[in-house]
């Protein structure tokens, strides 16, 4: 189940706030400019769907965001435990970084952990199937897919280039809880 855990920047072992209630999560994240919503990922995609199948199944959701925010491109990221690149990708995503655009993800299956570095706190957002998260441009963050990843998410972009990270060099991500 989706969850939001908040830590202070100086204390990575004891949370100061926790909730699994989507409305509470949306309110707390919204106060920081982060969009969090529960959408319906109700299409049967099979065991290992190709990107075209995922896009086709959720084109209506993509169209809604494009109409609302003017996004220009989208793709699908899908990761499974048997992917030979999983360790390299996990390592890359675990380094704190920012983007020059919003980072928008709609989870259509599985789960992943977004960790947002905001105002002296770390907001850990466990996103699961049905979750839409939009992290504002310039927000320092990292993403953990776990050591045995299983997720499929639609990524939506402001530009045609797709995912472009600017790494901060801050090792803060190393001290916070990760997915198993």
UniProtKB/Swiss-Prot annotation:
Pfam families: ARD. The record marks 105 as: Important to generate the dianion. GO terms for molecular function: acireductone dioxygenase (Ni2+-requiring) activity; acireductone dioxygenase [iron(II)-requiring] activity; iron ion binding; nickel cation binding. It is an enzyme of class 1 (oxidoreductase). Fe(2+) binds at residues 97, 99, 103, 141. InterPro entries: ARD, ARD_bac, RmlC-like_jellyroll, RmlC_Cupin_sf. Monomer. This is Acireductone dioxygenase. It comes from Erwinia tasmaniensis (strain DSM 17950 / CFBP 7177 / CIP 109463 / NCPPB 4357 / Et1/99). The gene is mtnD.
